[in-house]
């Protein structure tokens, strides 16, 4: 079976390295970009199955980049990886087409679940983001 292809977007190289190590055994990580505009360009060119992106990035934030991609007909599933626990960010990410909203503090336990859910068109939100434990 072919591995799902993932593109990462985060402006912290150390975090990109950790995410890659976490995802690589199960998925094909195509690469990483460090800002929202580069994400839009790379997603158009590479057509990944899933985008794992940070909310707060330079040039174009993750929410705006997701909106732009969806408006252009991008079919990639979107999983946000973030430090923001504010419900307004969660709502904005879901409204922008996100199927996953993962706390960076729970990345090791939640990210694989979120990607799997996104690939099957289901929403996954880290329990800490919804006030659960």
Predicted features by range, described:
Residues 35-38, 61-64:
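Acidic catalytic/metal-coordinating carboxylates
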Residues 90-95, 99-133:
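Short, flexible helix-to-coil linker/hinge segments that flank and couple to helix-turn-helix
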Residues 9-10, 33, 51:
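Conserved sequence signature across two-component system core domains
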Residues 44-46, 68-75, 96:
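Conserved phosphotransfer cores of two-component systems
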Residues 57:
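Receiver (REC) domain active-site loop signature in two-component systems and cognate sites
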Residues 13-31:
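Two-component/phosphorelay signaling modules centered on CheY-like receiver
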Residues 46-52:
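Active-site beta3 strand of CheY-like receiver
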Residues 54, 82:
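Active-site residues of response regulator receiver
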């Amino acid at each position: 079976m072919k591995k799902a292809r993932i593109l990462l977007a985060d402006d912290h190289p150390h975090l990109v390295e950790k995410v890659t190590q976490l995802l690589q055994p199960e998925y094909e990580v195509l690469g990483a970009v460090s800002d929202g505009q580069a994400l839009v360009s790379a997603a158009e060119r590479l057509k990944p199955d899933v985008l794992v992106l940070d909310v707060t990035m330079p040039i174009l934030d993750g929410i705006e980049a997701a909106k732009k991609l969806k408006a252009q007909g991008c079919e990639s599933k979107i999983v946000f990886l973030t430090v923001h626990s504010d419900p307004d960010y969660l709502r904005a990410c879901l409204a922008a087409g996100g199927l996953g909203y993962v706390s960076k503090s729970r990345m090791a336990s939640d990210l694989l679940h979120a990607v799997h859910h996104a690939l099957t068109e289901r929403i996954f939100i880290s329990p800490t983001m919804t006030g659960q434990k």
